[in-house]
Amino acid sequence: MNKEKAIVVFSGGQDSTTCLFWAKKKYKEVIAVSFDYNQKHKLELDCAKDICKKYNIEHHILDLNLLNQLAPNSLTRQDITVDKSAPKEGVPNSFVDGRNLLFLSFVAVFAKQKGINTIITGVSQSDFSGYPDCRDVFIKSLNVTLNLAMDYEFEIITPLMWINKAETWKMAYDLGVLDIVKEETLTCYNGIKADGCGECPACKLRKKGYLEFEKYLMN
């Protein structure tokens, strides 16, 4: 298994950017892969491109627009408003069915062609917002499936799986990239960079985590 190279599933948001710089500390060669699935917050792809260009990281954007046709949701459809809070039952309407399944599967195909075994993704079960494809059991299951499907030894690594947003901010701080993550990323479902709209679930979670992180710094 090649332990010197890694591919990061990279959206241009807080979590994946933190994982990208975490990977740069651990591996000699890091490649970032993003997806265009006709997301409303497509400005995140511009953030991803800008970050990779600025910090000299090889970057690829794969076309997955088909996902928008298959799975109507508030992240890809202009006529669906993003839920401001998670529903009591079921998944939020911002959940894109099959997104992480497809992202990781396509990245695995890409990785195998490059002779890379390690795939890094920023999913977290601690702050998973009700998304079933961010759970550890799903990632472990998919890892086994991909290995069997392609007769290849992949290792899917999830640095944020068991930490919350405050701890993710602390990781960025410890890596020396806090300002990059704070100012140059886009997490907002409404496509507003840095602090975002302040109203969507992603912005609320990001802000709550940052305030908790600030308290940690003061102690």
Curated annotation (Swiss-Prot):
Tell me the Pfam families matching this sequence: QueC
Arranged from A to Z, the UniProt key words for this protein are: ATP-binding, Ligase, Metal-binding, Nucleotide-binding, Queuosine biosynthesis, Zinc
EC number(s) per entry: 6.3.4.20
- Annotated membrane-spanning segments are none
Gene Ontology molecular-function annotations: ATP binding; ligase activity, forming carbon-nitrogen bonds; zinc ion binding
Decide whether keyword Glycoprotein is in the record. no
According to its UniProt record, which reaction does this protein catalyse? 7-carboxy-7-deazaguanine + NH4(+) + ATP = 7-cyano-7-deazaguanine + ADP + phosphate + H2O + H(+)
Q: Where does Zn(2+) bind?
A: C188, C197, C200, C203
As cofactor, the record names: Zn(2+)
Q: Name the top EC class.
A: ligase
GO BP: any one term:
queuosine biosynthetic process
User: What is written in the cofactor note of this entry?
Assistant: Binds 1 zinc ion per subunit.
The residues listed in the UniProt record as binding ATP, with positions renumbered to this chain, are F10, S11, G12, G13, Q14, D15, S16, T17, T18, C19, L20
Question: What binding partners and quaternary form does the record give?
Answer: Homodimer.
Q: Which family does it belong to?
A: Belongs to the QueC family.
| PANTHER family for the chain | 7-CYANO-7-DEAZAGUANINE SYNTHASE
- Which HAMAP family does the entry link to? QueC
This chain's protein is named 7-cyano-7-deazaguanine synthase
**What does the organism's lineage look like at the top?**
Bacteria, Bacillati, Bacillota, Clostridia, Eubacteriales
